[in-house]
C-alpha cells in the first residue's frame, strides 16, 4: 500500500491488479481513487515494484469495479448467513510525464541518495511532506538487502476530474519476482491499518508468507457476546484458502432452541490452483505486520 501526501487527501479502498503480459513484462494497476472534489496541490505517492517501469497509461474508472468484483466474488463464497456448524531520464532515471501526472521508477538506493532532487524533477516541492517522507517512508520503501525499485507518482490538480483516474504501469520484473505493495509508512504506534483488495495472476502459492500475514490480522471489534475470531488454513482440489473470519451465534426470534451461526468479515488469501491466481482481501483490519508480499512468478 503506497503512502500519500498530503495526508488530508481522502482516498478510496486500495485496489491492486498485477498480471502477466509476456515473458518479460507484467502490468500493475494500482488504484487509490481520490475522493476529494478538487485537488488544490499535487499529491505524492510511492510504492515498491519488482522492476523498472517501461510505460504508464491512464485507464477508465470502471476497471476498479471490475477488479473489486473479481476479488469480492471469491471471498463472498467463504461467508455464510446460516450453518449447522461453527468450525474452530535525468541522472539515468526515466520519467513519464503527462499534463496531470508525473511518474519515475528507480532503485531504492538511487531514490534515497537523490530524494529531494528526484521530487524536484516532478515539480514537487512541499517541504513538510518531503521531510516526513524521508523520516517515515524511505526506511520502509528502501530495502538495503534487495534494493527494490520504487515507483514515485505525483498526481497534479485536474487528475481527479473525468473518467480516467486509474494509472496502469507496464514494467519488467527482475529476479522472477512480483511485489504486491502492501507496506505502509512507519508510524509511532506499531499498528497498521489495511483496506486493500488485490488480484495477481501467474504466481506461485506461498503458504508460509500468507500464514504469517493472516495470523497477525486483527479483525473489527466485537458486537456479540458469542463472537469468535477463527483462523482457517484450508485446501481443496482447486483452492488454497488462508484467512480469518468473525463467527457468532444468534437465536431464532421464533424458536428459541434454533441457533443461527454466522461467518462474516473473511479476510486473507485465496489461491486458485488451476488459474495460478491469488486473491487478497484485507478490509478494515489492523496488524503489527508491515510488509509487502513478494511472490515467485510463473512464466
Curated annotation (Swiss-Prot):
InterPro entries: Baculovirus_p35, Baculovirus_p35_sf. One of its GO terms (biological process) is negative regulation of apoptotic process. Keywords: Apoptosis, Early protein, Host-virus interaction, Inhibition of host caspases by virus, Modulation of host cell apoptosis by virus, Protease inhibitor, Thiol protease inhibitor. It comes from the Viruses. SUPFAM superfamilies: Baculovirus p35 protein. The keyword Iron does not apply. GO terms for molecular function: cysteine-type endopeptidase inhibitor activity; cysteine-type endopeptidase inhibitor activity involved in apoptotic process. Blocks the insect or worm host cells apoptotic response initiated by the viral infection. Confers protection from cell death in mammalian cells. Acts by blocking the activity of members of the caspase family of proteases. Belongs to the protease inhibitor I50 (p35) family. This is Early 35 kDa protein. It comes from Bombyx mori nuclear polyhedrosis virus. The lineage of its organism: Viruses, Viruses incertae sedis, Naldaviricetes, Lefavirales, Baculoviridae. The gene is P35.
Amino acid at each position: 500500500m503506497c503512502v500519500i501526501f498530503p495526508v488530508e487527501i481522502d482516498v478510496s479502498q486500495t485496489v491492486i491488479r498485477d498480471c502477466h503480459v509476456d515473458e518479460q513484462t507484467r502490468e500493475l494497476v494500482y488504484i487509490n481513487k481520490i475522493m476529494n472534489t478538487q485537488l488544490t496541490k499535487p499529491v505524492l505517492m510511492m510504492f515498491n515494484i519488482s522492476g523498472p517501469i517501461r510505460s504508464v497509461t491512464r485507464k477508465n474508472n470502471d476497471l476498479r469495479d471490475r477488479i473489486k468484483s473479481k476479488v469480492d466474488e471469491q471471498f463472498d463464497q467463504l461467508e455464510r448467513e446460516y450453518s449447522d456448524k461453527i468450525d474452530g531520464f535525468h541522472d539515468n532515471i526515466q520519467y513519464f510525464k503527462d499534463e496531470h501526472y508525473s511518474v519515475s521508477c528507480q532503485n531504492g538506493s538511487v531514490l534515497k541518495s537523490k530524494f529531494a532532487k528526484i521530487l524536484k524533477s516532478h515539480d514537487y516541492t512541499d517541504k513538510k511532506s518531503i521531510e516526513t517522507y524521508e523520516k517515515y517512508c524511505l526506511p520502509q520503501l528502501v530495502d538495503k538487502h534487495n534494493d527494490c525499485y520504487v515507483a514515485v507518482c505525483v498526481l497534479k490538480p485536474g487528475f481527479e476530474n473525468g473518467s480516467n483516474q486509474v494509472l496502469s504501469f507496464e514494467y519488467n520484473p527482475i529476479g522472477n519476482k512480483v511485489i504486491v505493495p502492501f507496506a505502509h509508512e512507519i508510524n509511532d504506534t506499531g499498528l497498521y491499518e489495511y483496506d486493500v483488495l488485490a488480484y495477481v495472476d501467474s504466481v506461485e502459492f506461498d503458504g508460509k508468507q500468507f500464514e504469517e500475514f493472516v495470523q497477525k490480522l486483527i479483525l473489527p471489534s466485537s458486537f456479540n457476546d458469542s463472537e469468535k475470531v477463527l483462523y482457517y488454513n484450508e485446501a481443496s482440489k482447486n483452492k488454497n484458502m488462508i484467512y480469518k473470519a468473525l463467527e457468532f451465534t444468534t437465536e431464532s426470534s421464533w424458536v428459541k432452541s434454533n441457533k443461527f451461526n454466522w461467518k462474516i468479515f473473511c479476510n486473507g488469501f485465496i489461491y486458485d490452483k488451476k488459474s495460478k491466481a491469488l486473491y487478497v482481501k484485507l478490509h478494515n483490519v489492523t496488524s503489527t505486520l508491515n510488509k509487502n508480499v513478494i511472490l515467485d512468478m510463473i512464466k
